[in-house]
A protein has these predicted regions:
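Peripheral, non-AAA+ core regions of ATP-driven protein-machinery
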Residues: 1-205, 209-215, 253, 318, ...
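Basic, amphipathic alpha-helical bundle interface domains used for macromolecular binding and assembly
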Residues: 22-33, 48, 55-65, 276-277, ...
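Short loop/turn elements that form and flank the Walker-type P-loop nucleotide-binding site
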Residues: 47-50, 86-87, 117-119, 137, ...
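Residues immediately C-terminal
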Residues: 98, 290-291, 297-298
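P-loop NTPase nucleotide-binding/switch module
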Residues: 158-196, 200, 227-282
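Walker A/P-loop
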Residues: 205-247, 312
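Walker B catalytic acidic pair
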Residues: 287, 293-295, 305
Length: 493
């Protein structure tokens, strides 16, 4: 999501009419010649017949897209004498229509952030993108509607005030969800597991028969997700803006994304890629949730590609001359039946063979399972109409726990317990002797991996945070261990 500054250099000389663009432009950049020529003419200006050479520096980096139309036009207009010399700390971005209108482009937020880092003080962008760019403080964002207005602004014939936005108003947004946890009957232990997952950013797998409410619980999970911090909101918005999925009426995304891809999804669509690399579903779920329903129905090779991103929280896409890295710090919430027929462990009769169940479960590999906290939906719980808490009440507890974590990790580059490194685990997950013995016994009995050992401590830390406790108690650890015990039941017995 990082960029670089491109300087548009133009040389206009007498001679046979000729126009060449150099500096590794792609086809869309080369096509800018015709758009720019028409836009200048249709803005009431003469386009002289000259020999024109345009260089996009640095020349060793490929230039793609229609972002360069407006800066190319301004560079030529300065050479033609229609516009006075442009300041070094002023940048331009925008696509031109043939009639001179400045059209919106994708990725303005990321562009403005990078422009500020590179010392740009003012940037001229399409009017439709101005609100998005104005989210970045410390840089003046000027929105223009057409080329004529841009020329008049540069020549001091008109005044255009920098765009402003009210960030507090953007975050003041009533939370609306299609499913409230209070609408879901029973399932208290599953709701508890999902509350822990939301509070600590942990991954969760729900196993249960068809009709037990797994999908509804996952959709309800969106209603208890913690608020986005401003830095998280910026990162989420950048990714959606780059691929044109940012709502026009919402220049800043203030709610955590919830992505729900179909089980037929391809690897590039899930992970990211393509001829022109784009973020995949895991990056669109950054700082939010990726929900995979009917997990074993996904292609096994597709699921295995999640292992690296789940561990690294970023994904790299290699191309011939470059490597593009996208963030993918998401919570994985998955759901599946306990067997092919779906009735294993329920009150209904299971018609599957032992071999059939083992083959079905083997679609989820051990290394992938190690990255997921596991829970089981018990059929009997559906009939228990226990006290139902509203999502709003649960969300308050989740927000409080997340704020505790943000304060704890304020000097680190992480946001939640699930992101703790081994050194942070050692620092913040200290156990007393009784708890140490419990964990040692569970580790040996369940034959857990070293990664699972750390996962238990991370979950225990979150459970303690929900109690607003500085220390992990024996009961916190015992509850965390139970979320690891079910994976061995289903994958070993």
């Amino acid at each position: 999501l990082e960029g670089y500054l491109v300087e548009v250099q133009s040389d206009v000389a007498a001679g046979m009419p000729y126009w060449e663009v150099v500096g590794l432009p792609d086809l869309r950049v080369k096509e800018a010649k015709e758009r720019v020529r028409a836009a200048i003419k249709n803005s009431g200006l003469l386009f002289p017949s000259r020999r024109i050479i345009l260089n996009l520096a640095p020349a060793d980096l490929r230039k793609e897209g229609t972002y360069f139309d407006l800066p190319i036009a301004i560079s030529l207009l300065v050479n033609f004498g229609y516009v006075k010399k442009v300041a070094k700390d002023l940048a331009f971005i925008g696509e031109l229509s043939l009639d001179g209108k400045v059209n919106s482009v994708n990725g303005i937020l990321a562009i403005c952030i990078e422009a500020k880092k590179l010392g740009i003080k003012k940037i001229i962008v399409p009017k439709e993108n101005a609100k998005e760019g104005a989210i970045v403080s410390g840089i003046d964002v000027i929105g223009v509607e057409n080329l004529s207005q841009t020329i008049n602004f540069l020549n001091d014939n008109v005044v255009i005030e920098p765009e402003t936005v009210d960030l507090q108003q953007m975050f003041y947004d009533d939370f609306i969800s299609d499913v409230d946890f209070a609408d879901i009957k029973g399932q208290s232990s599953v709701k508890r597991a999902l509350e822990i997952a939301a509070a600590g950013g942990h991954n969760c797998l729900m196993i249960g028969p068809p009709g037990s409410g797994k999908t509804m619980l996952a959709k309800g999970f969106a209603s208890i997700l913690p608020e986005l911090s401003f830095d998280e909101a910026l990162e989420v918005t950048k990714i959606h803006s780059i691929i044109g999925k940012l709502p026009k009426d919402k220049p800043l995304m203030v709610k955590r994304p919830f992505r729900f891809p179909h089980h037929t999804i391809s690897v590039p669509a899930l992970i990211g890629g393509g001829k022109i690399p784009k973020p995949g579903e895991i990056s669109l779920a950054n700082h939010g949730v990726l929900f995979l329903d009917e997990l074993p129905e996904f292609n096994k090779a597709t699921l295995e590609t999640l292992r690296g991103p789940l561990e690294d929280r970023e994904v790299s896409i290699s191309r011939l001359n470059s490597v593009i890295t996208y963030p993918c710090n998401f919570m994985l919430i998955a759901a599946m039946n306990p067997c092919p027929c779906g009735n294993y462990g329920s009150e209904e009769t299971c018609t599957c063979t032992r071999g059939g169940i083992e083959k079905y479960m083997s679609k989820i590999s051990g290394p992938l399972l190690d990255k997921i906290e596991v829970n089981k939906v018990k059929y009997q719980e559906i009939k228990k109409d226990t006290k139902r808490e509203k999502s709003e009440v649960i969300r308050e507890r989740v927000n409080k726990a997340r704020k505790t974590q943000l304060e704890r990790y304020r000097d680190s580059s992480i946001y939640s317990n699930s992101e703790m490194t081994p050194s942070l685990i050692e620092k913040y997950c200290k156990l007393d002797e009784r708890s140490e013995n419990l964990l040692k016994g569970a580790f040996e009995k369940l034959k857990l991996s070293a990664r699972a050992y750390n996962k238990i401590l991370k979950v225990a830390r979150t459970i303690a945070d929900l109690r607003d406790s500085k220390n992990i108690e024996y009961e916190d650890l015992a509850e965390a261990i139970q979320y690891r015990s079910l994976d061995r039941k289903y994958w070993k017995n």
